[in-house]
Amino acid sequence: MKTFEGKVVVITGAGSGLGRAYAREFANRGAVLALNDYDSSSLRDTCALMPPRTKTFSSAFDVSDRDAMYRFADDVAAAVGPAHVVINNAGIAGVGAPAWALADKDFERLMAVDFFSVVHGTRAFLPHLRENADGAIVNISSLFGLTGAPNKSDYCAAKFAVRGFTEALMVEMTREPVSVHLVHPGGTATNISNNTGDTGFSDHFLRTDPADVAVGTAEAILKGRPRLVVAHAAFKTQVASSFLPRRLMNRILWHQLAPVIDTSQYPGTAARRAPRSTWPFH
């Protein structure tokens, strides 16, 4: 793909944060937008922020609803034409508690939104991308699709699943004219990230402007880069998780994160808590 001018770009979770930043970035590059969000009011706000010349189609629904996603793909094709780029961005952050304290329904809900919506979005739009013979699938993982973290077992599970699904898809699509991209944002300041019980974590780590991630993603598509690790702490974490012994990495993660998360449900936490390290996340 050489340009986004006139291309149909589908973005889920476009009502705020990174999804809204994607909408702005691709609108500024001349794309036709097909936007989704669960919150119809936020979705309307995003549409209103687009340049007047931008052709926009929008649909509010829950991305974990498989049938709704397939209807969306057909509705997009009917309204603005078959998709050229699909960005499976929608997600929720979870409740911010250790694995043993999570309710089954909360774990299942997060997996439905953060992982299975990516599967549904990819499979629903793939026939349309093939029809154009010039397309891109962009699946959003996370810093926590590179390493585990306390109070993030549900979120990490979903984002690692996105990573595995997308890496397999890259191999499967090798001989096709549709490129596949995996994005690992880290420390991105969005409403989704802020809506957890760990406000200290949000205040301390969520420093990156979503617009920077959106620019990096657009350039990755144009340059054919399959993986993008971008934003605060993501690259350092990728390197550390690849080369450090797991036990050392676990200690670093705990020392770094324990002071800024809710540790009230950890037995003996106060006695075990160590001074916070400033690496690899700074």
Language model segments and positions:
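Conserved glycine-rich cofactor-binding loop
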Residues: 8, 15-16
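Residue(s) in the substrate-gating loop at a strand-loop-helix junction
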Residues: 142
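The beta1-alpha1 cofactor-binding region of Rossmann-like NAD(H)/NADP(H)-dependent oxidoreductases
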Residues: 40-41, 60-71, 104
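Conserved glycine-rich Rossmann-like NAD(P)H-binding loop of the short-chain dehydrogenase/reductase
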Residues: 29-45
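C-terminal helical subdomain
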Residues: 182, 202-237
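Active-site helix of classical SDR
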Residues: 122, 158
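Substrate-binding pocket helix/loop in short-chain dehydrogenase/reductase
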Residues: 97-99, 103-108
